[in-house]
Amino acid sequence: MKYWNLKRTNQSTFEKVGPIPRSITNTFEKFRKELDPNGESEAIEEFRLSRHQTITSVKYIFLLLISPVLVNQASKFFDFGPCIDYLWNQEQPKIFINSSQEERAFAELQRFEEKIHFEVLLNPSGNISYEIIEKRVQLKARELGEYYANESANAVKNILSDILSIAVFILLMITGQRQISIVKSFLNEIIYGLSDTAKAFLIILFTDMFVGFHSPHGWEVIIEVILRHLGLPESRDFIFLFISTFPVILDTIFKYWIFRYLNQVSPSAVATYHNMNE
């Protein structure tokens, strides 16, 4: 494999922010390269370097995304899954592991009983005895018990598999410092290559999605899914506390980033953002 001069690649994207906006310095740098007699050979070298950077970045991003998912699914179905199922069914299986599961199961069973009662009221002349109703309720309760017992076992599998996936992701990050620097350079070149309007659009999209007026509803759904995935109780107090503080923290970090960094790197993008946001 050919070793490229990566120092030159990362220099433009990781240099400290100076008093002159980067767009102006890039314009002078482009003008200097056009007057350079060795500009053609440098352009070919930069193209090869850019292609190597793109291929390496795409491969490493794909590896970071796919490897933890594959490890998660493989460990869940082939390693932790059989062990958890065996231990879970050794004795009387525990149906519920938190109060939220009980509440959902009881509510679903109550709706089923009310549905049967409603059917009886609609058809009073039908041959539906109390024994038949009781049997249907018992079958439904048994079905709910099996469903939530499997959900409880799957929550334990999810916790173990997620821990292993996080460990694999951290290991890839630690052992891939060189690739990470290339990916950072690649992403920075993509971001700074966008027009000011595109940058402002992405900023508004991100802020409205995660810290905007309707974001609490999305955060509520996300937290409920995560808690249910891990088998944790879906505490409404915790969810409301999270969605009332975390978006505020994100909004503060975002505004500081605009003031401290983006305002010096691309002031025209900040001006476009303020004009579009008004």
From Swiss-Prot:
Keyword Glycosyltransferase in annotation: no
Paired cysteines (S-S): none
Keyword entries, A-Z: Antiport, Chloroplast, Hydrogen ion transport, Ion transport, Membrane, Plastid, Plastid inner membrane, Potassium, Potassium transport, Transmembrane, Transmembrane helix, Transport
Transmembrane feature ranges: 61-81, 155-175, 203-223, 238-258
One Pfam family matching this protein: CemA
GO biological process: potassium ion transport
Full protein name: Potassium/proton antiporter CemA
Gene Ontology MF, one: antiporter activity
Family to which the UniProt record says this protein belongs: Belongs to the CemA family.
Membrane protein topology class: Multi-pass membrane protein
PANTHER family referenced in this protein's UniProt entry, alphabetically: CHLOROPLAST ENVELOPE MEMBRANE PROTEIN, CHLOROPLAST ENVELOPE MEMBRANE PROTEIN-RELATED
Localization terms from the record: Plastid, Chloroplast inner membrane
GO CC terms in record: chloroplast inner membrane
Gene that specifies this protein: cemA
Organism this protein belongs to: Porphyra purpurea
Purpose of the protein: Contributes to K(+)/H(+) antiport activity by supporting proton efflux to control proton extrusion and homeostasis in chloroplasts in a light-dependent manner to modulate photosynthesis. Prevents excessive induction of non-photochemical quenching (NPQ) under continuous-light conditions. Indirectly promotes efficient inorganic carbon uptake into chloroplasts.
InterPro entries, A to Z: CemA (IPR004282)
Reaction equations catalysed: K(+)(in) + H(+)(out) = K(+)(out) + H(+)(in)
Entry keyword annotation includes Transport: yes
